[in-house]
C-alpha cells in the first residue's frame, strides 16, 4: 500500500514541497533564506495576532494601549519586542534572499522572481502601515510624509491623498484603516508566497554553479529540512537576544512620545530597512521625480532578467561582475547611511552620487560587463 503522505490530497501537496522535493545537492546556506522568510512570516502573524487582541486603533487610546500591552499584559513586552524586531529580521532575510538571487542568477526563473518582487512590495507596505499603529511621533509624521508623496500624482494627487487619509489630515480614520490593512496584508503575503513556491517548484531550485542539476538531486527531507532547522535556530536565537537585551536598538526614540500634529520632529526618517529607498527619494529635488525614483528603486529588480547579457547564469565564475555586485552592496549601505542623515552638505551630494550609481549598476554597468565577459571568453 502506498504511503499516505503520497496519496492523501492535502498531505501530497506538503510532501511534494517539503519531503520528496528533488533538491540540488550542492545548494549552500544562501538557499536557507526562503524558509527563514517563511518562519519570519509565521512568527510575525502569531505575535501580531496576540498584539491585536489588546491593541485599540483609536488615536486617543492607541499609544496608551501599546504601553498597556508592555506593562500589564502577561509577556506583552516580549510579544511586542519580538514583533517589532521580527520585522527587522524579516527585512534582513529579504535583502539577503534578493542578494542571493542577484548573485546566482536565480532571477532567470522569471515568474518566481517577479512574484518575489511583488512580495517584497507587499511586505514593505505591511511594514509601513504597521509602523504607524503605535501612534508615536515618528509613526504619525512618517505616515504624513509618505502618504503625502501621493499628492505628486498629476491631476488626481490631492484627491488620492485625502481618500487614503479619510479626511484632510492623518487622523482617526487613517489609523483605523491602517490597522485593518496591517491585519489583512500578512495573509495576502502568505497567499502570494504559495504562488511564489508553486512557480519555483515548476523549475526546481537554482544552484551555486548555475548549471542544470537534474542529474544530481537529493530529497529535501532529511537533508535540507535539518539544514533549514539549523538556520531557524540561529535566527531565532539572534531575534530573541535582540528582543531581550537590546529591544529598542533599531527603533526611533521619537516614538516614545505620543503623536502631536503641532510638533514636527527635527529629522523625519523611516525604520532602517527603508532608509536606502528614502535616500533615493530625497536625492531628487522634485516631488514627482523623487516618487518615481522611489518606485523605480524597487521595480528595477523586475528588469534584471531582461538585461541579463552573460552566457553564464551566476557570478561564480565572473570576477568582473562579482566586483559590480559588491559595489552594489556597498552602495546600498551608503544609501542606508545617507537616508538616516539630515539633508545638508555633504550628505546631499553623497546621496545623489550613490543614487545614480545604484541605477547605473542595474541598467548599464551589469549588462555591459556581462557582454564584455562574453567577448573576453570568445563566446
Curated annotation (Swiss-Prot):
Mind telling me which residue stretches traverse the membrane in this protein? 33-53, 77-98, 113-133, 178-198, 226-246, 288-308, 320-340, 347-367
Positions with a binding annotation for heme b b562: 83, 182
Q: Which residues bind a ubiquinone?
A: 201
Q: Which UniProt keywords apply?
A: Electron transport, Heme, Iron, Membrane, Metal-binding, Mitochondrion, Mitochondrion inner membrane, Respiratory chain, Transmembrane, Transmembrane helix, Transport, Ubiquinone
What's any GO biological process attached to this entry? mitochondrial electron transport, ubiquinol to cytochrome c
User: What Pfam families would the database entry show?
Assistant: Cytochrom_B_C, Cytochrome_B
What this protein is called in its record is Cytochrome b
- Origin species, per record, is Anguilla reinhardtii (Speckled longfin eel)
